[in-house]
Regions:
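Carbohydrate-recognition beta-sandwich/jelly-roll modules
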Residues: 76, 113-129, 134, 173, ...
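Extracellular carbohydrate-recognition regions
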Residues: 32-64, 264-267, 473-478
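Extracellular glycan-recognition surfaces and repeat-rich motifs
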Residues: 53-72, 303-308
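Extracellular ligand-binding interfaces
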Residues: 73-150, 161-166, 173-176
Length: 855
């Protein structure tokens, strides 16, 4: 992942009014940092307006665009991936809203920047992203700018692709907000507590339910009351009245665990479901203990439908108010089918108990007692993600592991709007909330005894199966030729060597990974004055051994490992002290430790080094304490941030531990961490290139932008796929080879097929626009992954038997004290024996070395 300015992200405040309609609730008092609903707007006041009947109204093209005005419309001709234009001088106090009418036929997101009298330069921190619709039709947009101070100029970035954008009008509007704000609502049983804030300069008299109170200026007050009624489940609308001001209303949901109900029972050995005969909700029980609710089973517009139980012979069937609802229990699963004549929400799962882990696939991966929509990984308003664009959801799964149960929700129609909040800050009820919105909903709930989150992931995949692998974009021969083309010439290769990326500002070095890949593809070793380690995302060090540099390799790897050992703590951990520790509850993480463990164990595998093996295994044993894959991309993302690269490192490390020791506990660890990576992989598609794309992290670079949720970074995925290829021979829990192959094919689909960057892999890929985004990475790693999945050698071969260990650049086996190497007649190469002795070989094709012979 590399930062690139062409990204455009939406401003969440532009979608919150819609979400307020879609969702039916308030905000928990225990989560005051999350306010999903904006203050109500009383009226608007226009501050400034641009029209284009007489020209471009002072706007200036600044980068990769040209401006003209025709027929009272501003025409913006984008000529690249980063067009932007600036307004003339303005002198207005913020904050305010930009209202504009636009049509676009380009791609990407829109973004506004602003400058002020005290901050005269543009900066990502003083900007706001928003979604653009690129269908060539007129659309109205409202974008709130949280500008502080006096704004002097605006900059508009109208997307990130070439094409035409037109603006009919643009205005700056001040919003006059309701002085009162319902900041939170929380229910415990029938008791409702709300926090009411007065933002006005004077005290305000108001009434909440049957209570009259006066709120002093700029203060908040908590009001608690008991909802009337005795039913187990009810929707209650809280109303706040204040003189002539419009009333504030918020619908909350009451789930009363102590209430006596008229129940219809669904039973299995795994769970009992007590369903209210009026269809309002259900209790979930295991062994007589309440572990959660499905409450409501369905509702819309803040109201429970009047349902009638029309059949209870086997499955339960309810009908009424234009809704048909069916419940069917099969063991630990509860199937729910909802058919509505309009949009509704259901089933609403409310898992009870202390959170051990939570998952919203592609959006949230939570640890013990963590909150969803937190600012630990994203500090802009995009952290509010309880109802994301469904395109960001990688697979249909929301799950909670608590001290009472493992509960999960999966569905079939990926156009449904999933809702996820823990704790439930949306409609105020207890527990952890997962639900779906739409007209026709088919969902399955899982209710099991307490179990790890990985069990829910595995269950969801097994419900649907892994999807078919996408078709390859080209033949194998053409694929390898395309990758080779990128490596053989400019812009990636210069006289100094290769860049990790093709852009000119990436330093060029004689990278071993690049040179080794060329040798694998052509059989010819590039002539280089020296070798530099790395260069790709997957190490390929063959060239050291075919150019007489095995001793250099051994010295460099030994020094690397000795440095890692020196940095390991006595308990086996590795601690991080950089700026990206901010917000994390400790100074270590699973991915950060695993990246060091890999180096130790790979070296132990190649050389038999006892210190590397001992410290590597100590790291594996320490990492058993971790449950969330995170902290592997601390060059730009928080140590806390959930991360598929962490899953990749952990699988790699634990597979090596198992191979070196035969201890199946390490294989169990590899399997567990492999499962944690699955929710980062897209297992559905509505675009030509999408299936098996991989979300890299569930957070943002520098906590701000880019936000990587829903923005695939396939190189992180193919690192994970490479680790799965290592695991596949040892474990059949899932078809790891198929999963890895799907990720590889999608990476190859994303490769540039032609043009300046032909053969390079884009750093990220925008799904909606089907757009490749820089930087443009060398293809060494996907060559390695393809070779490995085909059962071929991609880098150095290691074989161990009969008390010996051999490293060679060709396939090698050890039998009866001899190394058997399948090389190529006439080539010269080196072999490392037992981590110490380097033997030169001139190949006869099938070479045999006596490992017990005197040096």
């Amino acid at each position: 992942m590399k930062f690139f300015t062409a990204l455009r992200r939406p401003h969440p405040r532009t979608i919150l009014p819609l979400l307020a309609v879609l969702l039916l609730g308030g905000i928990g008092s225990f989560a005051l940092d999350i306010q999903p609903f904006p203050r109500e707007v009383l009226r608007t006041e226009k501050l400034h307006e641009w029209t284009f009947a007489s020209g471009v109204a002072g706007f200036m093209a600044q980068h990769e665009c040209a401006l003209s005005a025709t027929g009272s419309v501003l025409r913006i001709q984008s000529r690249g991936k980063d067009p932007y234009l600036a307004s003339g001088s303005v002198n207005l106090a913020g904050p305010f809203m930009v209202q504009l009418r636009m049509k676009s036929a380009t791609g990407g997101k829109g973004q506004f920047f602003w400058t002020t009298t005290t901050e005269p330069h543009t900066d990502e921190a003083r900007s706001q992203h928003f979604n653009l619709i690129h269908d060539g039709q007129w659309h109205d947009y409202s974008v709130r700018l949280d500008a502080r101070g006096t704004v002097t100029r605006l900059r508009l970035d109208p997307g990130s692709a070439p094409g035409l954008v037109e603006v009919e009008k643009m205005a700056l509007v001040h919003e006059h907000l309701h002085p009162l704000e319902l900041q939170s609502v929380h229910t415990v049983g029938r008791q409702i507590s709300l926090t009411l804030t007065n933002h006005a300069e004077t005290a305000l008299a108001c009434r909440v339910e049957d209570r009259a109170l006066t709120l002093p200026a700029h203060t908040a007050q908590q009001v608690t009351f008991t909802a009337a009624g005795k039913a187990p489940f009810a929707a209650h609308t809280v109303q706040v009245l204040a003189g002539n001001l419009p009333p504030l209303r918020r619908t909350v949901f009451v789930a009363d665990a102590g209430a006596t109900g008229d129940w219809v029972m669904l039973r299995s050995p795994e769970a009992t479901v007590r369903v209210a005969r009026d269809g309002s909700g259900a209790r979930l029980e295991i062994g007589g203990q309440l572990v959660g609710f499905v409450a409501p089973l369905v509702w819309r517009n803040g109201k429970l439908p009047q349902l009638k139980l029309v059949s209870e012979a086997g499955d339960l069937h309810f009908a009424g108010d234009g809704i048909n609802l069916t419940l069917a229990q099969r063991g630990a699963e509860l199937a729910v089918a909802i058919q509505g004549d309009g949009a509704c929400e259901g089933p609403v799962l409310r898992a009870l108990g202390a959170l051990e882990q939570g998952l919203f696939a592609g959006v949230e991966y939570l640890g013990k007692n963590e909150r969803s929509s937190s600012t630990l990984d994203i500090e802009t308003e995009e952290h509010i993600r309880y109802a994301p664009d469904p395109l960001k959801v990688t697979m249909p799964l929301m799950a909670f592991s608590t001290d009472r149960a493992l509960t999960a929700l999966t569905w079939t129609n990926m156009t449904l709007q999933p809702i996820f909040a823990t704790p439930d800050f949306l409609d105020g009820a207890e527990g952890h909330r997962a639900a779906l919105r739409g007209r026709h909903i088919a969902a399955t709930l899982l209710v099991r005894k307490p179990a790890p989150l990985e069990d829910a992931i595995l269950w969801a995949v097994q419900q649907r199966g892994l999807p078919p692998v996408p078709p390859a974009p080209r033949s194998r021969e053409a694929q390898m030729a395309l990758s080779l083309k990128a490596l053989m010439g400019p812009p990636l290769r210069t006289a100094e060597g290769w860049g990790h990326c093709a852009e000119a500002h990436w330093p060029r070095h004689p990278f071993a990974d690049c040179a080794s890949t060329i040798w694998r593809l052509t059989g010819e070793a590039p002539q280089l004055p020296h070798l530099a380690a790395n260069g790709g995302h997957i190490r390929n060090e063959s060239l050291y051994f075919v150019t007489g540099r095995a001793q250099q390799w051994l010295q460099e790897r030994t020094a690397e490992v000795r440095g890692i050992i020196a940095g390991q703590k006595p308990d086996g951990s590795f601690h991080y002290t950089g700026k990206y520790q901010r917000g994390h509850f400790e100074d270590t993480a699973s991915g950060y430790c695993a990246m060091h463990a890999i180096r130790l164990l790979d070296f132990a595998r190649a050389t038999g080094d006892r210190a590397a093996l001992a410290t590597g295994l100590k790291a594996l044993d320490y990492m058993k304490r971790f449950r969330t894959p995170r902290g592997a991309q601390i060059w730009e993302c928080a140590l806390h941030t959930p991360d598929i690269l962490a899953s990749a490192h952990l699988v790699h490390a634990y597979v090596r531990g198992f191979e070196l020791t035969g201890d199946r506990a390490y294989l169990d660890g590899a399997r567990r961490w492999a499962i944690t990576g699955v929710p980062f992989v897209y297992q559905w598609s509505c675009q030509p290139v999408m299936l098996y794309a991989t979300t890299p992290v569930l957070g943002a670079t520098n906590w701000r932008a880019p936000n990587w949720i829903g923005l695939p970074v396939q190189w992180c995925g193919y690192d994970y796929a490479y680790a799965l290829a290592m695991l596949a021979p040892h474990d059949k829990t899932l078809d790891w080879h198929k999963l890895a192959e799907g990720i590889l094919i999608t990476a190859e689909q994303m490769q540039y097929p032609d043009g300046e960057f032909a053969g390079c892999v884009p750093d990220s890929f925008s799904l909606a626009e089907q757009q490749r985004n820089p930087w443009n990475i060398n293809p060494c790693a996907i060559v390695s992954l393809r070779l490995v999945l085909e059962g071929q050698l991609d880098s150095l071969a290691v074989a161990a038997a009969d008390g010996h260990r051999v490293v060679a650049p060709y396939p090698v086996t050890v039998r009866a004290g001899k190394a058997h190497i399948a090389a190529k007649a006439g080539v010269s190469y080196q072999v490392l024996i037992d981590g110490a002795r380097i033997v030169p070989v001139t190949s006869r094709g099938n070479d045999e070395l006596d490992l017990n012979a005197a040096p």
